[in-house]
């Protein structure tokens, strides 16, 4: 999480933002680690992050609200989001919890693979061409199918107390969140490309 957060801040600096890297990077590490101790600490870390960034903003007149926002977003986007998979792993003890975490990742991987295969072969209707020109609705539904297949397999194992419809819903949600993450990343990447071309 700290490497991802650092890279995000590097890109934002190319765009003229000045994040507080120390506070943001520390928060990005503490978010997933705090879950291992007690999920309540997530709230504490959130509070401290807002408090420290508020003090930074008040103390330094040159600090812009955009710098504060970028610092907070970087820590949340990387560390806080990563803590979700840690929470999932800790929710179920033993190897079943580890297997479920791997299953979530596998559903994302298969979703991406099916989206690429279906989209590259049948993709004609673009989702958001201005942000991600190669993403199509055909690929999106192919990705949904791939993710749902993994979750049906998870249900079929009988290791978890979930029914078929809930497993299908999980597959759909994971796939949609994966697409959202891809689009968000695609929205961020042009910042670095633009500045690299300029140099």
Could you say what each language-model-derived stretch is?
Residues 180-193:
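Transmembrane alpha-helical segments of integral membrane proteins
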């Amino acid at each position: 999480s700290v490497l991802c957060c650092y890279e995000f801040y590097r890109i934002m600096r190319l765009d003229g933002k000045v994040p507080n890297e120390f506070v943001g990077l520390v928060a990005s590490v503490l978010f997933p680690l705090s879950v291992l101790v007690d999920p309540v600490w997530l709230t504490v870390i959130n509070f401290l992050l807002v408090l420290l960034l508020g003090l930074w903003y008040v103390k330094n007149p040159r600090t812009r609200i955009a710098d504060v926002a970028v610092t907070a977003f970087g820590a949340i986007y990387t560390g806080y989001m990563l803590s979700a998979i840690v929470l999932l792993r800790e929710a179920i003890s033993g190897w079943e919890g580890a297997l479920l975490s791997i299953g979530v990742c596998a559903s994302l991987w298969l979703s991406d693979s099916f989206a690429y295969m279906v989209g590259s072969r049948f993709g004609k209707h673009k989702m958001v061409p201005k942000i991600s020109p190669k993403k199509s609705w055909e690929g999106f539904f192919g990705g949904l199918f791939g993710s749902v297949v993994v979750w049906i397999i998870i249900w079929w194992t009988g290791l978890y107390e979930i029914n078929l419809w809930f497993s299908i819903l999980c597959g759909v949600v994971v796939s949609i969140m994966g697409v959202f993450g891809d689009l968000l990343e695609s929205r961020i990447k042009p910042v670095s490309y633009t500045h690299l071309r300029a140099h």
